[in-house]
């Protein structure tokens, strides 16, 4: 990414301002090169909220992934827990736009991460609904265990311990 500022300076401003995808990627570059400036995160998030309908869906997927990674790698992993709420919102947006599904399936790691973040922000009802709605999008051989284990996790956070025990007895290790 060295020298990117010099390249950007040579692109006519009118082109940058009128091209949504180029603008989005320029903001993403700033997000990567100056991670301490949260403003770039919010700027890209706002641009996507307003203009994602005019951007190719593959580009939208990539740009939301940049936002998600920023929340995780630059903020949460460095102790900025405020970004759990942001990460949760990004996951919700990605789900609503079906950006996390590949051939109708959700990667088990994404499923787990969404649940973990949802529980962290205490969105228990939402997480329970997510589990019920998306477990069938996991590989078939993982569905029943994922359902039982993750529902038990929700019930644990809700202090419904008898349900936790009941569900954990059904989990195969």
Please give the residue ranges for each predicted region:
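TPR-repeat structural position
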Residues: 80-84, 124, 161
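Residue-level signature for tetratricopeptide repeat
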Residues: 29-34, 73-77, 116-120, 154
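Solenoid-like repeat scaffolds
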Residues: 9-17, 49-61, 92-105, 132-143, ...
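Alpha-helical adaptor scaffolds
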Residues: 112-122, 131-172
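Acidic, serine/threonine- and glycine-rich low-complexity intrinsically disordered segments
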Residues: 73-74, 82-104, 111
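"A position-specific structural signal for the A-helix of alpha-solenoid helical repeats
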Residues: 23-29, 66-70, 109-113, 146-157
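Flexible inter-repeat linkers and adjacent short helices
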Residues: 1-33
């Amino acid at each position: 990414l060295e020298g990117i500022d010099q390249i950007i300076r040579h692109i006519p401003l009118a082109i940058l301002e009128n091209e949504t995808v180029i603008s989005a990627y320029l903001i993403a570059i700033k997000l990567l090169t100056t991670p301490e400036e949260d403003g770039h995160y919010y700027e890209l998030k706002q641009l996507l909220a307003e203009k994602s309908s005019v951007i190719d869906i593959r580009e939208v997927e990539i740009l939301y992934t940049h936002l998600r990674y920023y929340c995780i790698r630059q903020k949460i992993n460095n102790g900025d827990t405020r970004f759990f709420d942001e990460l949760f919102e990004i996951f919700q947006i990605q789900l609503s736009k079906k950006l996390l599904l590949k051939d109708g399936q959700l990667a088990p790691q994404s499923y787990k991460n969404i649940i973990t973040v949802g529980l962290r922000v205490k969105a228990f009802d939402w997480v329970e609904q997510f589990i019920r709605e998306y477990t069938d999008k996991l590989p078939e051989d993982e569905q029943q265990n994922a359902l039982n284990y993750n529902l038990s996790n929700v019930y644990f956070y809700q202090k419904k311990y008898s349900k936790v025990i009941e569900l954990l007895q059904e989990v195969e290790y």
